[in-house]
């Protein structure tokens, strides 16, 4: 038995080593971003200042053709400087959050399991459920490739930086997919998390609701990377292949729209099996589409003469496509929240209990506010929330996952007494007052 426990212990220590390396690379990425944004750090330029729409000849720096016969070039469409810096910082923060999550998981797993082959095997299973070793490797690779792209952008080596960022797209996509699924089918994942409820409540809180939060953060991260990578493709096409300005814009926006729609569909079909409350991917897609729309509006305003010459209808089509992606993201966000509430309502889970409690508190607050102002009580559907169960502060519904339904309570009533003369006897007659004695 001791010989069987030794490989499990080796696997556990290797996972701990991977967590340490991953946390170190995530921290190094954050330090690199801070240094690349500091003027006195030694880097020549600010990495997030990728494009400049001033009227000047950029033939030496690269860019898209504006007037090929005159040698005039202009930069391709890209995000604004604060947006680029914010997206990169969010990537570093999410990777650091995953590293902190893994450290907390390692501490909890170690405290609640000690000695024996079964304990060692259970520790490895929980470690894989927290973050698979392959996901740690992909996350470290994502941090390293983004760091390389930031350094190249600081030196304004645009073609190589764009190619590096496009290569950076693959590791985060694989990392998010493997981290969210934990390498398990949806049914097995739900069963593994549910089994921790009785065996290890502390691990269940971390690997259940806590991991659901991390899945939302990771989904939002991938949405932002999907919004940045197509614009990097436009930079590569404009500077490396010498395409026109309109061609680079149309190519970048088209790739983003297709990738965003595919990502939203896969999120609803695949990732929703692992956590029902999943607004992160749709919200991240909405943010990415909005940021690209703001950047494209400024871009078309600054270079309106060139855009009208090359493609008069390009601006309207780009804005229409981005608006469609944003509306689709909003629709998918609402759909996911509605389906999540219906799912938890059907299961009678704790999440639906919290939602119902919040709704009841809001209804009580509205009722008190209206009564303090002397307003009439609500009618119709709004008044349905203000029933006895809502107005009572002492009653609190408790919802547990897969809990059996409660039997209906029958109110106790006092037995009715028939109204009759016997039940209500007449009072005794009053005695006459004593006579006065003279």
From Swiss-Prot:
Positions of region (Disordered): 395-438
UniProt GO cellular component terms: host cell endosome membrane; host cell Golgi apparatus; host cell membrane; host cell nuclear inner membrane; membrane; viral envelope; virion component; virion membrane
Residue spans crossing the bilayer: 14-34, 89-109, 133-153, 159-179, 213-233, 249-269, 277-297, 318-338
Intravirion compartment segments: 1-13, 110-132, 180-212, 270-276, 339-438
Main subcellular location of this protein, as a coarse class: virion
Record PTM: N-glycosylated. It is not O-glycosylated.
Biased composition (Pro residues): 425-438
Entry keyword set: Disulfide bond, Glycoprotein, Host endosome, Host Golgi apparatus, Host membrane, Host nucleus, Membrane, Transmembrane, Transmembrane helix, Viral envelope protein, Virion
Membrane-side (Virion surface) residue stretches: 35-88, 154-158, 234-248, 298-317
Taxonomic superkingdom: Viruses
Localization (cell): Virion membrane; Host Golgi apparatus, Host trans-Golgi network; Host endosome membrane; Host nucleus inner membrane
Membrane topology summary: Multi-pass membrane protein
Protein family membership: Belongs to the herpesviridae glycoprotein M family.
Subunit text: Interacts (via N-terminus) with gN (via N-terminus). The gM-gN heterodimer forms the gCII complex.
Function in brief: Envelope glycoprotein important for virion assembly and egress. Plays a role in the correct incorporation of gH-gL into virion membrane. Directs the glycoprotein N (gN) to the host trans-Golgi network.
HAMAP family, A to Z: HSV_GM
Protein name: Envelope glycoprotein M
Organism per entry: Bovine herpesvirus 1.1 (strain Cooper) (BoHV-1)
């Amino acid at each position: 038995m001791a010989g069987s426990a030794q490989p499990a212990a080796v696997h556990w220590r290797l996972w701990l080593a991977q967590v340490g390396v991953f946390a170190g690379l995530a921290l190094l990425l954050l330090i690199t971003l801070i240094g690349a944004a500091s003027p006195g750090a030694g880097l020549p330029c600010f990495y997030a200042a990728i494009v400049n729409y001033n009227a000047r000849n950029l033939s030496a720096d690269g860019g898209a053709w504006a007037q090929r016969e005159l040698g005039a070039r202009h930069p391709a469409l890209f995000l604004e400087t604060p947006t680029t810096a914010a997206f990169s910082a969010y990537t570093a923060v999410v990777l650091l959050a995953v590293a902190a999550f893994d450290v907390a998981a390692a501490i909890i797993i170690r405290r609640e399991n000690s000695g024996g082959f079964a304990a060692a095997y259970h520790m490895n299973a929980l470690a894989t459920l927290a973050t698979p070793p392959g996901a740690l490797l992909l996350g470290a690779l994502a941090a390293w490739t983004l760091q390389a792209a930031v350094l190249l952008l600081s030196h304004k080596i645009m073609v190589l930086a764009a190619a590096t960022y496009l290569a950076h797209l693959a590791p985060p996509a694989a990392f998010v997919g493997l981290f969210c699924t934990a390498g398990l089918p949806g049914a097995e994942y739900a069963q593994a998390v549910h089994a921790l409820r009785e065996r290890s409540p502390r691990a269940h809180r971390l690997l259940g609701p806590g991991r659901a939060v991390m899945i939302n953060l990771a989904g939002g991260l991938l949405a932002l990377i999907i919004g940045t990578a197509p614009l990097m493709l436009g930079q590569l096409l404009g500077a490396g292949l010498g395409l026109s300005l309109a061609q680079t814009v149309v190519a970048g926006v088209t790739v983003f729209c297709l990738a965003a729609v595919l990502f939203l569909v896969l999120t609803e079909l695949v990732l929703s099996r692992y956590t029902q409350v999943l607004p992160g991917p749709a919200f991240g897609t909405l943010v990415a589409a909005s940021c690209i729309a703001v950047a494209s509006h400024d871009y078309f305003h600054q270079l309106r003469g060139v855009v009208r010459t090359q493609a008069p209808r390009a601006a309207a089509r780009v804005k229409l496509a981005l608006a469609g992606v944003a509306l689709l993201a909003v629709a998918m966000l609402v759909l996911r929240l509605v389906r999540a509430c219906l799912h938890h309502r059907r299961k009678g889970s704790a999440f639906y209990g919290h939602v119902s409690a919040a709704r009841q508190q809001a209804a009580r607050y509205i009722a008190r506010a209206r009564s303090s102002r002397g307003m009439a009580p609500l009618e119709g559907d709004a008044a349905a929330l203000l029933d006895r169960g809502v107005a009572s502060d002492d009653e609190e519904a408790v919802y547990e996952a897969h809990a059996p339904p409660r039997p209906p309570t029958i109110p106790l009533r006092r037995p009715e007494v028939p109204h009759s003369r016997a039940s209500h006897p007449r009072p005794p007659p009053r005695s006459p007052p004593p006579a006065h004695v003279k």
